[in-house]
Amino acid sequence: VGCGGLRAIDDRHGEIKRMYVAPAARGTGVSTAILRRLEAEARALGWERLVLETGEQQPDAMRFYEREGFSRIPLYGHYVDSAISRCYGKSL
């Protein structure tokens, strides 16, 4: 139905990777449940901040992350030169 992962950036920061929910399961709370679990795992690892990348062609994803407390940040890492990426961050 859905998935998501975490990648360490350093001892205090991590990145949400590959978060996806099947179209049929969107709007059912699955996205929120996955994100809450990822945030809990990040806190358990001692991380203070999470970042993520999504595509500018994914307005539902952008609204979701903003609703969940993420703010737009400058492009980072592999996405610095991307014309189609939007990056977000959230302090835990």
Where are these regions (language model features)?
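C-terminal "cap" of GNAT-fold acetyltransferases
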Residues: E48-V51, G55-G69, P74-L92
